[in-house]
Amino acid sequence: MKNQDQALIFEVSKEGRIGYSLPKLDVEEVKLEDVFESDYIRVEDAELPEVSELDIMRHYTALSNRNHGVDSGFYPLGSCTMKYNPKINESVARFAGFANIHPLQDEKTVQGAMELMYDLQEHLIEITGMDTVTLQPAAGAHGEWTGLMLIRAYHEANGDFNRTKVIVPDSAHGTNPASATVAGFETITVKSNEHGLVDLEDLKRVVNEETAALMLTNPNTLGLFEENILEMAEIVHNAGGKLYYDGANLNAVLSQARPGDMGFDVVHLNLHKTFTGPHGGGGPGSGPVGVKADLIPYLPKPILEKTENGYHFNYDRPEAIGRVKPFYGNFGINVRAYTYIRSMGPDGLRAVTEYAVLNANYMMRRLAPFYDLPFDRHCKHEFVLSGRRQKKLGVRTLDIAKRLLDFGYHPPTIYFPLNVEECIMIEPTETESKETLDGFIDKMIQIAKEVEENPEVVQEAPHTTVIKRLDETMAARKPVLRYEKPAPVQV
């Protein structure tokens, strides 16, 4: 039996109900006034829910049953690589020698963990074609910012203080211009051509002596490989700029092509995506950054090194940009990524890309008769459709996404990239079977037919979820972020 009207945990609360008993205090009691200034001490007790352990278990178990994740269903969220995360990763991450160590331990006592991190760096160097890697950044956008700070340090060390502009394509991830801004750069947009690739003539127009870097995803966010990448690298390098690789779409080229061989100077990776660290719930992530030799002096300190005496962190880095994270990255995610890489091997990683690309092209060809296909060519790991023909019939891409919820599917990414009208971006990943793909495709075809025959069904969706249509404008402008007790009912 499912309770469709799930109470808030505060509404389950009963005064005086206790979930846990705490042990008797066995240390000296300290008054808060002796530790904190009065401004930081509550005048009244916090209004926390008073519930039993059973209440807590039932409440959060019921809520968890409403969630959708990779383990519960198909998750074709474009540009997010929502692949299945092998559970062997979790087993290894829970080894006592990994799970129970502390980052402040003496290096001599954690040599095994340091060896794993060093070996992971070596694997990532081989995969990307870079000269070295740091595991310190905590996530993708954090890696972007770190890479841009390295580029900034490089230019400033060479006296190029006028290189203040970073070029990004009009199909770029939103984090690219955001990271550039946070790193102190001005963002310049380069246009895509009619084939969905960077327009070389427009690139030549915007590149100049103020260019610090060009940020690219390859394949790009339209799922298309930038086939002119070598010429693009030459254009940027001849102008004195650096080429930055956003590793969001690395799943499309594993063991097939390497960013370093394409001419990229800096690369960030998303271990929580490509290399199966769990993601989608807000963290933690891991966004290692790889660089070519001329950027090594500026890597954040410390760097992990191997000597004849074992592994150690080198803090003697006078030109480093400093730390970008306490300690040395999100170790647990790095353990999971290392486990995945070692279990797959080079042939397995090559197969990852082959099946990811095959799945995406299969889905694209089956759906093309029912939705507009902006770029009718082979895609890589993901592809974009357009809901333009459905919009002409009064149904938006947003409606299509909400209708998919009725069938138990997480919707694809919608309205991104921004250069495709009514965009629907689908990434199936390599871990899904043909049967799963066909099930999703059949529902997308059904929705396309409903738009033509009974559009109200789609316009009013979802119909089967606990929460129906939200007032998205009010949710954005006047969000309710704190629980407030309802006013007493006057009798």
UniProtKB/Swiss-Prot annotation:
EC number per UniProt: 1.4.4.2
N6-(pyridoxal phosphate)lysine modifications at: 273
MF terms in GO: glycine binding; glycine dehydrogenase (decarboxylating) activity; pyridoxal phosphate binding
Tagged with keyword GTP-binding: no
Gene3D superfamilies xref list: 6.20.440.10, Aspartate Aminotransferase, domain 1, Type I PLP-dependent aspartate aminotransferase-like (Major domain)
InterPro entries: GcvPB, GDC-P_C, GDC-P_N, GDC_P, PyrdxlP-dep_Trfase, PyrdxlP-dep_Trfase_major, PyrdxlP-dep_Trfase_small
Residue ranges crossing the lipid bilayer per the database entry: none
Lineage: superkingdom: Bacteria
A Gene Ontology term for the protein's cellular component: cytosol
Keyword vocabulary terms for this entry: Oxidoreductase, Pyridoxal phosphate
CDD domains, per database record: GDC-P
Cofactor(s) for this UniProt protein: pyridoxal 5'-phosphate
Reactions it catalyzes: N(6)-[(R)-lipoyl]-L-lysyl-[glycine-cleavage complex H protein] + glycine + H(+) = N(6)-[(R)-S(8)-aminomethyldihydrolipoyl]-L-lysyl-[glycine-cleavage complex H protein] + CO2
Record's keyword annotation contains Transit peptide: no
GO biological process: glycine decarboxylation via glycine cleavage system
Known function: The glycine cleavage system catalyzes the degradation of glycine. The P protein binds the alpha-amino group of glycine through its pyridoxal phosphate cofactor; CO(2) is released and the remaining methylamine moiety is then transferred to the lipoamide cofactor of the H protein.
Alphabetical list of PANTHER family matching this protein: GLYCINE DEHYDROGENASE (DECARBOXYLATING), MITOCHONDRIAL (PTHR11773:SF1), GLYCINE DEHYDROGENASE, DECARBOXYLATING (PTHR11773)
Subunit structure, interactors included: The glycine cleavage system is composed of four proteins: P, T, L and H. In this organism, the P 'protein' is a heterodimer of two subunits.
Family: Belongs to the GcvP family. C-terminal subunit subfamily.
NCBIfam families with a match to the protein in the record: PRK04366.1
Name by which UniProt lists this protein: Probable glycine dehydrogenase (decarboxylating) subunit 2
Record organism: Bacillus cereus (strain AH187)
